[in-house]
Amino acid sequence: LVGSEMCIRDSNNSGEFNYPAHTGNWALLVASSKEWTNYRHQADVLAIYQQLRQAGYTDDRIILIVEDDIADNVSNPNKGVIQVTIGGNNVYENVEIDYRMSSLKAKDILAILNGEKSESLPTVIESTENDNLFVFWSGHGVPGAMCWDEEPYAMTGDDLSTVFKDMNLKRRYRKLLMMVEACFSGGVMEQCEGIPGMLFITAANGDETSKADVFNGEMKVWMSNRFTSTFIEQITDNKDVAMRDLYYRLFINTVGSHVMVYNAENYGNLYSANMSEFINFKNDKSK
């Protein structure tokens, strides 16, 4: 199904896959913009961070990348406070930031994903074939690429596909879920299809922009994006939601763009696979 209808590839026919035992979780959260006008990107990533912490992730299993120029910004009337809804919780509370966005290049994200430590990258994903990996990216996008600050073609689908294939060869994950809130994001993640055990959900297809959500007239900024706010609503209500049901709810509630799912045929049955494997999994290493 294409066009204005839901687009999910073969999910109803996908069989079950034989995955290794699930013993741990990792997360990489990235806001790829800075400055007050882009408030929503960092706010959304911090809101996801709070969801993971509440679900039992420890900070050593979350790599958080934001510019951190919002909470104490001169334009912020409530210093030290970042929210995704008017009057909502402070998603900046007790955060542990691993890297400022401006201290990295987009390609550093690939090294972090692939566990490549260096003097400039002391903290990386150290996952194994028994770990599920959740990646959430929020920022700007252009056709065929995701932006890094003001660099428009900073991260392409080929860039991600190359490192994902290497991660698969090295058995650096059990399952990987990557969600992208960016304009034209579908065109990037579509290039990553064909890799076993990975699922990609994007806020928009490859030909359209994604949409902001919740405008704060006093602060003169958008506080969130529609895709992310819907995602947070869904996992707050039910952290065990099936992937197919999550996609359906994202699709019907994300007005103005078409939420897309890619690589379902290489992931498994989306009716039985669910978010608890990424957002609500309890074990001795991440709780």
Map each language-model feature to its residues.
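Cysteine endopeptidase catalytic domains of the caspase/legumain-like
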Residues: R9-K287
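Short, small-residue-biased leader/transition segments that mark boundaries at the very start
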Residues: L1-I8
